[in-house]
């Protein structure tokens, strides 16, 4: 500590000197890449959440969250975030898998191309009909033997939560 000599008469006054903590907002891409740079600022001050969008193969970026599993507070680019009083806060990238719907012509040809979308999202079944010599196309089904759910072109199909959904041509 420093030494302070009191004056011979009167009162000596000491003044406290304070410095505001510099704190950090970090971004964790959770398997992605291209995350924003960390942001620093004064403790308890507001910063704008970065609009830089990370990428991850086979996933769609859905935003940032204060908890890795997405159970915290959601943030998007441009939102205001209040920095902590000390240390570092982290925002975690949130991802939705991109899944596919494929069409199996079961011996036919000219089937529609695969469709992709976010997990559990709706897509419209293609109106493109495959052909097969000597057969009439009856529609699509989720089971090869026709025992699943029937779909016709233009119907709404909900993509699976992961992997690939397949519709089989029925003849």
Which residues make up each language-model segment?
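Secondary-structure capping and domain/repeat boundary segments
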Residues: 1-171
């Amino acid at each position: 500590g420093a030494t302070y000599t009191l004056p011979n008469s009167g009162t000596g006054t000491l003044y406290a000197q304070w410095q505001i903590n510099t704190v950090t907002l970090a971004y964790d891409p959770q398997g992605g890449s291209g995350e924003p740079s960390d942001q620093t600022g004064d403790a308890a001050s507001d910063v704008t959440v970065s609009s830089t969008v990370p990428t991850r193969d086979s996933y769609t970026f859905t935003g940032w969250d204060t908890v890795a599993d997405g159970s915290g507070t959601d943030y998007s680019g441009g939102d205001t975030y209040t920095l902590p009083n000390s240390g570092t806060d982290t925002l975690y990238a949130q991802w939705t898998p991109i899944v596919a719907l494929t069409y199996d012509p079961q011996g036919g040809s000219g089937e529609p191309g695969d469709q992709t979308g976010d997990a559990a999202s709706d897509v419209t079944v293609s109106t493109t009909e495959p052909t097969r010599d000597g057969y009439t196309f009856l529609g699509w089904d989720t089971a090869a033997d026709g025992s699943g759910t029937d779909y016709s072109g233009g119907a709404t199909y909900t993509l699976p939560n992961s992997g690939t959904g397949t519709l089989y041509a029925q003849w």
